[in-house]
Amino acid sequence: MTEQVQDENKLIAERRAKLESIRPNCSANAHPNTFRRTHKAAELQEKYGQNTKEELEALGFKTSIAGRIMAKRGPFLVIQDVSGRIQAYAEKGVQADLKDRYQGLDIGDIIGVTGQLHLSGKGDLYVNMEEYQLLTKALRPLPEKFHGLTDQETRYRQRYVDLIVNEESRQAFVMRSKVVAAIRNFMIKKEFMEVETPMMHVIPGGASARPFITHHNALDMPMYLRIAPELYLKRLVVGGFERVFEINRNFRNEGLSPRHNPEFTMMEFYMAYADYKDLMDLTEELLSSIAIELLGSAQMPYGEHTVDFGGPYARLSMLEAIQKYNPDNATIQAMTYEQVKDLEFMRELAISLGIKIEKFWTCGQLLEEIFGETAEWQLMQPTFITGYPADISPLARRNDDNHFITDRFEFFIGGREVANGFSELNDAEDQDSRFKAQVDAKDAGDDEAMFYDADYITALEHGLPPTAGQGIGIDRLVMLFTNTHTIRDVILFPAMRPQA
């Protein structure tokens, strides 16, 4: 056992002893639930922080505050609630009267304090402790330096401690909540209806990904946690709901990385009588408006860069982007779509770029890999990449002028994909053929290929109007708004391997 663990165990034992010592004096419960707060710290700071000492004394304002003790300096306590911090002061007479109970308070304890509001000689507001009540005894100590945890794994495993001691973490999740609320309000104003679709699917679909598998005991059948809500949302458009959206979780049984978590949040929406270009316009309006609403500016820092959400955003085809970011590669500069359709040409090109290829990859998959390796990471400013090949876009409408590609885009900021959208494939026969091609790909070893969904084909046969749909990754968007570089910093409880 390390010295640090021994010290912590000793502190825990001391705190447990303090809790036991107060139990006999508690008529009902050592964790009372009758104290009522009248003000939060920020309310008091905002309303009375500009008053002089004399004005506050003349006012004689009495308040009740509650929160966690974050520091204890002689007669002063620093108390933190959800809004901020304020001090409490045990003047000599009160401290003498309540000396034993006051001395028993520890950093981390949750207390309620009632008293008159004053201003210290340093200009800090404080509440004179005329009365106080221990509401919850903290049995475990907080990290010594309450201005932050340094161990990243502890921050993720014990998010509750991270939120107590790290203001930056708290503000990141406050911003996350604001981003989600702003998106929801924007969509409702645009006359989209919020809906909820199943989280467990009989057939996984709507994206190319490996699903989590579970078992339904009552029905005695396998089921899948959803990888995307797309096919259910489009069924609703078939049913006559012309504008729908859903903000919810998706689950993909894949790797962990700074930009991937197996459980993540998406906002997915569909609008009838629109195409992928309308989606790009709507995305520009959405992001610029919420940036201004939440940050006061369309420009925001991200790492060493300044991201400009003001628009208009760059729009490049995938082939154009590859050529733009490989200016010295003569083969790429001369490449045409006819060559992109040549499987051997694409394999040789990928290998020449140092890409390890899979034998079952199609021309479209090879093009996407080349884009990902050579261009994607350079897209720091908001950029729409269009012209995705049909063989990697099984749910997207083919382009009228070039049937090899689809009317699809992915949206990139900060070198990563944030959104994916396209004009929806509403040709039931074409969708049937593409599902069958996905089944062949799965049989060839592609674990992320889609399943055949006969019920969705039946829905399309009833008629899906011209429709465009898009998914926006909430977690990655929040990473931008909080200037963080790992998805774990914006997910309250990220996936972690259990501790040994």
From Swiss-Prot:
What are its E.C. numbers? 6.1.1.6
Q: Which SUPFAM superfamilies match?
A: Class II aaRS and biotin synthetases (SSF55681), Nucleic acid-binding proteins (SSF50249)
Cofactor binding: number and manner: Binds 3 Mg(2+) ions per subunit.
**GO BP, sorted A to Z:** lysyl-tRNA aminoacylation
Reaction(s) the record says it catalyses: tRNA(Lys) + L-lysine + ATP = L-lysyl-tRNA(Lys) + AMP + diphosphate
Q: Which GO terms describe its molecular function?
A: ATP binding; lysine-tRNA ligase activity; magnesium ion binding; tRNA binding
Q: Which UniProt keywords apply?
A: Aminoacyl-tRNA synthetase, ATP-binding, Cytoplasm, Ligase, Magnesium, Metal-binding, Nucleotide-binding, Protein biosynthesis
Give the residues the record marks as binding Mg(2+) 1: 410, 417
Q: Which Pfam families match?
A: tRNA-synt_2, tRNA_anti-codon
Superkingdom is Bacteria
Q: Needs which cofactor?
A: Mg(2+)
A Gene Ontology cellular-component term: cytosol
Q: Which Gene3D superfamilies match?
A: Bira Bifunctional Protein, Domain 2, Nucleic acid-binding proteins
The subcellular localization recorded is: Cytoplasm
Annotated Mg(2+) 2 binding lies at: 417
Tell me the InterPro entries matching this sequence. Answer: Aa-tRNA-synt_II (IPR004364), aa-tRNA-synth_II (IPR006195), aa-tRNA-synth_II/BPL/LPL (IPR045864), Lys-tRNA-ligase_II (IPR002313), Lys-tRNA-ligase_II_N (IPR044136), Lys-tRNA-synth_II_C (IPR018149), NA-bd_OB-fold (IPR012340), NA-bd_OB_tRNA (IPR004365)
**Subunit structure of this chain's protein:** Homodimer.
State the family it belongs to. Belongs to the class-II aminoacyl-tRNA synthetase family.
Name of the molecule in the record: Lysine--tRNA ligase
